[in-house]
Amino acid sequence: MITGMDARRTWLVTGAAGFIGSHLVEQLLLAGQRVVGVDNFSTGLRENLDLVRGAVSAERGSLFSFFEQDIRDRDGISELVSRSKPDVILHQAALGSVPRSIEDPLSSHESNVDGFINMLDAARKVGVQRVVYASSSSVYGDIGDGAKVEDRLGAALSPYAATKRIGEIYAQVYGRTYGLETVGLRYFNVFGPRQDPNGPYAAVIPRWLAAMAKKNPTAIYGDGSGSRDFCYITNVVQANLLAASVPSSSAAIHSVVNIGCGATTTLMQLQQLLRRHIARVVGCQVDQIPEPALEPIRQGDVPHSLADISFARESLGYNPTHSVEQGIAELVQFELAKTA
């Protein structure tokens, strides 16, 4: 058991109906924690909350309270945090997607910067012990190839990246100015069950999986040599709980920490992994699943992304349990079992 999870605390999870947030809510309830969930359903799904309730006992489910609330509503969020009096906030709410931010930068700023400051200030006023918040590997921008280290940043390549970097700065300022303990987690390409495959801003793995399962064509932006550090949701849940529970003396406090696997997979390798595991589960030949089409690289995309997770290991005790292949195998089994 992670240190600090043996005693019951109150946790506020923003973005609770989202992909990552719903997994955090589920794990906290399974651990017997009291959880307050917040979401405005701009990208989160009610179905995810239903899945959470179905995964825990009625007794554990009674520890969960949910509020439909927009983090951009300063007064509403302040009142909710004041009423809930959480010990810890796990802040996952955001408008994700680089392409979305390029098309609509103001909405990204309002959710990812203004909304986050609202959470920080509400936490400060109530005396929340710690805020763990989601940042992104996109903040590394054009730093170049090689493993990304927390203190070496390039120029931001999208409004989304800018919003996440601004959030990191505000969190650190709230720490220095008000003593609010914060830990930022720079996620590297998280994937897993409950990730929405639909819409123009869907992440690559759920989008490809949904298409390949129906033997529909897929597309790679670029020549397939671009690479990412894909990180399974189980690893990300572990990182959040560790960040919320490490002692105040940890070097992670008031810092940002890379959360990935420390290994890269090219987009073409990812295609092959998905095709192989889908073929195994549905009982078809790999060559019955169409090869991807190659399309021009999208604006704001970086060619390669790899996390140096040394600091996460040292400061949090983070140890990813699922490799990309293990995560893909588990994800494919889960998603295709739903349609069997």
Q: What do the predicted segments below correspond to?
A:
Residues T10, M212-A340:
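C-terminal substrate-binding subdomain of Rossmann-fold SDR/epimerase-dehydratase oxidoreductases
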Residues Q69, D73, P197-Y201, A263, ...:
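Residue-level signature of the cytosolic catalytic core of signaling kinases
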Residues G146-A155, A203, A293-P296, I309:
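Short glycine/proline- and charge-enriched loop/turn segments
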Residues R152, A156-T163, Y187, P197, ...:
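The catalytic Tyr-centered alpha-helix of NAD(P)H-dependent dehydrogenases
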Residues I166, Y170, Y174, V204, ...:
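Hydrophobic alpha-helix immediately C-terminal to the catalytic Tyr-X-X-X-Lys motif of short-chain
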